[in-house]
Every structure is written in structure tokens, then in C-alpha cells.
Amino acid sequence: MRRAKKVPKTSAKADERRESLFDKYKDPSEDSVGPEGVERLCRDLQVDPADRKVLLMAWKMGAQQMGFFSRSEFEQGLQVLNANDVHTLKTSLEQVAIKVDHDPDVFQSFYQFAFKFCLTEPRQKIIDIETCIQMLSIVMTNQAHLQPFIDFLQHQTEYKFINNDQWMGFYRFSVEVAPDCSDYDEAQAWPLLLDNYVEYRQKHP
């Protein structure tokens, strides 16, 4: 069950400003912000659509579909972010980025969201390797295992897809295992994917 977002108290004027901001970017024929609206919002925020802050925004807004924000997601998300215009949204996203990088529990929540956000089809439980690499590159920053793991994924041929256990396993691995894998313990029952990664690292130190 998804945890309910803590929505701060707000004024009628602030509600109107959030509604106005949603209306500015929403699709003319749908009551949602679609890809074109997201692109315009990104331009106004002065960020690339592939920037980490856009994924952070989707996370804080509880977005269910990549590239889209429903009215409730957008307006309640702005409320959660304590923002009611582009300027305050930009500032809030910068603060969220700092918190994610300094609070392990917050980062883990963001990291877990990133995988689920990539599941675009009903009953989908896996993501392809290319999507995994792209998402890892956005979500993780300055992590010692990130680039070596990406190199491994690009060179290996056994795995075409990644599941949630493997995705979360890499998070735990990145936190618990030394950059050179010297303290890696097979007895901890890591996903086989990570056993193979360690073997790759031993061959490519």
C-alpha cells in the first residue's frame, strides 16, 4: 500500500495559483499534463526533461504514468512541495535533491520509486537493460559502483531484463560492499546478477 503524502495546509489563494499553473501546462483536450506540457514546464524550470529533478518531481507528485501528471497528482504534488509557481517549484526541487543525497532512507524511497515508474504496462514486473542503465544514471550520483556496474551490464549477454529484486539488490550492494568488492560475501545470498558483477570486477579491476 502506498503511503499517503503529507499535504500541508494551504490557502484558497495558493490553491488558485496551483490550479492556474496546472491549467498553463495541461493538454488542451485532456485534464492532465502530457508530454508536451511536461516539456514546456521543463523549459520554464530551465532543466532538461531527462534531468534528475524531473524524476524527483514525479516522485514527490506520486505520478503513476511516465510523461503525465493528472490534475490531482500535479496540484497535490505542488502542495506537498510547498510550491505554487515555477520559481518556488524550482527552489523546492533543489531542496529535495539535497535531501535525497544526504538522507539514506529518503534516497532508498526515491530509488525504489524509479523502478516502479518504469513499469509502463499492466502486470509488467521487469525493465530492459537499456532502461535500467538510463535510470541508474539519473537516480544515482557519485556512487562508486555505478559506472563499473553499468559497464558490466553493457558487456554481459546473459541478462536482457532486470526485476525489482535485482534492482533493490544493487542498491543494498552499493551501500554495503566496498568499492573494490573486497568484502563481498557470497553467503549473504545476493542475486546471481551481482555474483556475476563481482566476477566481472575481479577480471576487470
Label every PLM stretch briefly.
Residues 94-161:
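Extended, charged alpha-helical interaction scaffolds
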Residues 134, 142-205:
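Intrinsically disordered, low-complexity, Lys/Arg-biased terminal tails
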Residues 59-61, 153:
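Short helix/strand-bridging catalytic loops that position acidic/His residues to coordinate divalent metals
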Residues 1-30, 35-38, 51-57, 65-123:
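EF-hand Ca2+-binding helix-loop-helix modules
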Residues 43, 51-55, 158:
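Generic structural motif recognizing short loop/turn segments at the entrances and edges of beta-strands
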Residues 61-62, 177:
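A short structural micro-motif
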Residues 33-46, 69-83, 126-141, 164-177:
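Amphipathic regulatory helices of Ca2+-sensor modules
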